[in-house]
């Protein structure tokens, strides 16, 4: 199956040809760990988790690198405010980041290098840029000379004159041009020794050095949020190509769209910053969060709002009912149990490792093993369904055609709705295969409906059902409906039956 990817560099949807047919190399800009990640940060991680899953399905091996920026002005400020060291702040928020991605069932990247573990490589790259005539040192600072790179602006589709003279930049009399950017910042507070004096690296050089260290001078895919296209990715591309003459750096650039909340940009001043913890505390399950994030094409803007959450809940309830009614999920455990039918899990027991060594050989080997297990299991399952020669083959093909068409998750979800409808319409002899296919396609997307995630207790649900029954007897249907809708927002579906007691299904 051919994979097509929208390449920001060309502005076109292109057929994907990796440098090697045996291994795909992908780098994604990870978090700057100074605060709890908001849902916009998490969207990017979920997007590239989907990309990773598709690549694992289509290619023998994938090396997925996502960095951790653990030295930055924002981290230094946060540490100063708290009166602690920078590494304590960084480790704390790195842990929360990983915790949130674990809740959303994201596969671990192959390698997760940290900026502070690669300072020497950054210094070497900066020296190479100076030697090649692309950078200059002034007063302990080192700047990249944007005028020395003819392709500057190609990625972000901006004219060099606009970039150099038209953008808003810091006033710095040491710069040759207003658009020149920092490679090494002189600092005697948080610093490392260098040929130019004590200081620390600029943000852009960090990713360039870590891609070179983990993937080499040329690799296949570079991903990140649309907000990183300029200046971060433009600068990263410039310094990497100049430090490694003849290199093309990343061949395909992929950018995910912005995320807003109720039509507005997230802001602490507006009080509308949303993160995984606050959503889960409000009753939104991790499966629902993930489903909302993949329900819009990765490249498009996504607005987080109650309507989107409601649509996700309705879809997942529909899928779960199809799985319950088919017997794939046992009805006796529909709200409290889990089911293992031989699909991949990312929750295998891990070796004891030093949490400060995210790029250690042990962790890399573990992550490669998990990715290989996921790829093997998924291919075994879908080769089986794809070879049945019936509706299963059709749905399997349609689903993966969508996923191979620029990671079209909305199209793939539409196939799931058709498949779910099919589970209810076909004869008994076909139900089992179709329902198992539905379950496994959801697993491929990172959604496991076999595990109850709702934090709403059974006692609370029963008490609400009793209140609702009392309201109906008293003909207070407005309040009865309010209770029903309130439970639905928490992922609990009430089912009324003509000749049987009311029951419920929980996500």
From Swiss-Prot:
Gene Ontology cellular component annotations, sorted alphabetically: cytosol
Keywords from the named record: Aminoacyl-tRNA synthetase, ATP-binding, Cytoplasm, Ligase, Metal-binding, Nucleotide-binding, Protein biosynthesis, Zinc
Reaction catalyzed: tRNA(Cys) + L-cysteine + ATP = L-cysteinyl-tRNA(Cys) + AMP + diphosphate
Sequence motif 'KMSKS' region, location on chain: 265-269
Gene3D superfamilies on file: Cysteine-tRNA ligase, C-terminal anti-codon recognition domain, HUPs
A GO molecular-function annotation: ATP binding
Family annotation (SMART domains): DALR_2 (SM00840)
Domain of life: Bacteria
GO biological process terms held by the UniProt record: cysteinyl-tRNA aminoacylation
Descriptive protein name: Cysteine--tRNA ligase
PANTHER family: CYSTEINE--TRNA LIGASE, CYTOPLASMIC, CYSTEINYL-TRNA SYNTHETASE
HAMAP family: Cys_tRNA_synth
Keyword check for Aminoacyl-tRNA synthetase: yes
Cofactor dependence: Zn(2+)
Subcellular location: Cytoplasm
Textual note on the cofactor: Binds 1 zinc ion per subunit.
Any one Pfam family match given in the protein's UniProt record, by short name: tRNA-synt_1e
Residue numbers binding ATP: 268
